[in-house]
């Protein structure tokens, strides 16, 4: 069927900020969809609140709105733009929920706007637990016994009838938010109460647990002519009971017989046809390992995380084709862009194995609840491709960047058998490593299967890896053993460990015997047809399919999996860098391991290598491609950490040189550089042991900020007030050593701001200064940032610009640089310099209109700012006010304290822009879901050192109609100063303590601060987690509360008696 002519203007709804459960895969999907619709001649309007995305670049759609994804704002944009249709299926759960809200509010009917892709009835049938159950019964598809409940009592009655364990699934939530497996009535009551609150329709499904079944997923496509096909089937390593986003996944399925595969395939196609979905859809099924019995678990009537994985695993561009299907094109008339000859109706065939392993944030959150269940906890994922399962699994392990080069954690060799068995049974994020350790200790795979319900096939593969390790131990320097290990994915580093040699020795041995990897193409058709895609993975076989180009090439290193501190912002910079390389006439090669991102879309670069970002894997690509040089500036700390070893191997690092990168990262060299440049910094010293650290702190004076050197996202950073705390920090948080010194700095409690600069070595362009709303002590990634600055004098801005210029030129910076400053008593100090692209690049690029990563790349390739038409110094400021606000995923991470501090905790960001600070702040708070009612009750529980400041805030809250409540000490202080506050009870005082008041809806906001010492006070943590669980706005920094107050005051009318 030809594309529709009756619609011209289509609105695409984005997925908003990155949170756990909804990450970069939607930037990838949305970007593909917008470009596909433009390609077909439609006018595309995009709405999204996340500035860190490629999708929100001006050239992706005809009009781009970076506005809050709330009914209020989306309605305004719709009324202004009057689109003919809306495509909501590429914006994740956010997009679907927005479509439902627009429909319920009558806006779609009122303006005669059509929904494309998935009809409302299908969204309802797939998402509303009752309707889904009815549909499955009509289709004769088995689902676990279940009931829909709207109260806790209904849940208890049902569970008593069918027996425990049961699973709770709240309706219309994302990534299993609020759900869980319950083994007792007590757990059921707690989880259901929470789930009902988090479900927008106050509805939960309670179902019989089928934990232990195999979990299988089918990614299916259908068009308006009812053509349907399976793009990819995937099998979870972990059985049902662990959210698929937290499971290790293999594609294609590994343990299904033909009969089982056909049975589940038929079920999936039957479901997508019944739902009449036009586009992509994901079906999750549970299969009994011992019979042909299966159950349908759920259906996502949209592009999802699994579709991004399926797209990258097969090369089949699901989102692009889904967008075209939505406007009437059919699968049998669209060409598959990979082969350029076959049609999209052709089901992909794979002659390789793909492994996906999730990346969890527990290296940042040591106290987080690590046990996995039906609620997702991973922030990102890695994917690896190999010719056998062992190879793809080991490549994925070393892609994770968690300090392992194999499926082995050396620290586990010391744990007791008892602890090992517990960890194998109770699945945590690192269960794979415990299983492998158990096999190394001689546990049989049959024993492990009965404990974990993981299929024997997978456990046998882990056993095979251990057998190869043993073979290597017995045959040191043996060429055949080396070849076998390489064929099954072993890294040079692991083989070197076993043979007690250096990694370079193994590399030399391989080269002397011409043992190199070859690169195979991902072609969707198992090499049956010629493919045109330059998309490759390495393996140790005979035939190489990747040929070095005759054009000069540049290799750009990506940033690996998304984790806290290194998010989609770095992928944004990578993609822009590639565009600039191509414009300059070079061939652009990307190397990355993250399946969710735009950079790993094969159409972005001239060549894509889907490989781990390790020295060995990068060198193998360099040996084959012989690029002119490598760019490491845009891949976050991942790429920067590879610079030294690549340079030592004779590779040309383009842009800022390795010794200059080192001067910015190495404490003593940096201090020396600042002294020479005449730039003040907080007093500080490096310490390699406890004694030195105590000596340094004594000299500098408490409080001090302590942290390890060479980290990203403020990992293991703390503010300490006395000797005891410093000793405690050194013993528990870091292992200080001469190789890994710790930094001890004077802690300056002042205003923070940061600058991104672009330098060609002679002149320096400063696109803008961002002022942080929260004072020093809160990580820059967790602060709200304002551009242009609202409270910095002209003189301070000039000083900042001057220091930035001196630094860029003094450190021989070519390309990007980020500098952070703290200002106290009109004195400007430099806190740190990062000689690379930072997480503020997308935001600043959007608000200034300067394509920063592209300009930086042009300078790296030899042009000057003058050539590009840019002046030296601070760029003219925008007339609008722009706010970048952090977004957190605390609802997904039990036992992670939401208190803000020097260690980064946010997973994403939103942006608010308007003509005044108050309006921009209002938009930023709305966009990150911190909606505060205009009156109500607010609780203050404040540390002694900030009570005076909190008092003035409390008075202002009272003036606009809030009732002030406070804990004992705070209430007493307020009373002394003449402000009466309602006293709340101590924790445990059942009727009147804060968690109880919050649970019963009596509290609209909480302001809770702790002293500099920031001790893990149990009461404070209970208060904070109750606010997070119940969705009550929580302010742990007074500056944020003050910003919110500014918004409320601006929306208030003055009401006075005459």
Swiss-Prot record:
Region called Carboxyphosphate synthetic domain, residue ranges? 1-401
Report whether Coiled coil shows up as a keyword of the record.
no
Q: Which cofactors are named for this entry? A: Mg(2+); Mn(2+)
For the region Allosteric domain, what residue ranges are annotated? 930-1058
Which residues hold Mg(2+) 4?
832, 834
Provide the residue positions that the database annotates as binding Mn(2+) 2. Answer: 298, 300
Q: Which residues bind ATP 2?
A: 707, 746, 748, 752, 777-780, 820, 832
Give the pathway.
Amino-acid biosynthesis; L-arginine biosynthesis; carbamoyl phosphate from bicarbonate: step 1/1; Pyrimidine metabolism; UMP biosynthesis via de novo pathway; (S)-dihydroorotate from bicarbonate: step 1/3
InterPro entries listed in its UniProt record: ATP-grasp, ATP_grasp_subdomain_1, CarbamoylP_synth_lsu, CarbamoylP_synth_lsu_oligo, CarbamoylP_synth_lsu_oligo_sf, CbamoylP_synth_lsu-like_ATP-bd, CbamoylP_synth_lsu_CPSase_dom, MGS-like_dom
Binding annotation for Mn(2+) 1: 284, 298
Please name the NCBIfam families in this protein's record: CPSaseII_lrg (TIGR01369), PRK05294.1 (NF003671), PRK12815.1 (NF009455)
Question: Subunit notes for this chain?
Answer: Composed of two chains; the small (or glutamine) chain promotes the hydrolysis of glutamine to ammonia, which is used by the large (or ammonia) chain to synthesize carbamoyl phosphate. Tetramer of heterodimers (alpha,beta)4.
| Domain notes per entry | The large subunit is composed of 2 ATP-grasp domains that are involved in binding the 2 ATP molecules needed for carbamoyl phosphate synthesis. The N-terminal ATP-grasp domain (referred to as the carboxyphosphate synthetic component) catalyzes the ATP-dependent phosphorylation of hydrogencarbonate to carboxyphosphate and the subsequent nucleophilic attack by ammonia to form a carbamate intermediate.
**Name of the molecule in the record:** Carbamoyl phosphate synthase large chain
The scientific name of the source species is Streptococcus pyogenes serotype M6 (strain ATCC BAA-946 / MGAS10394)
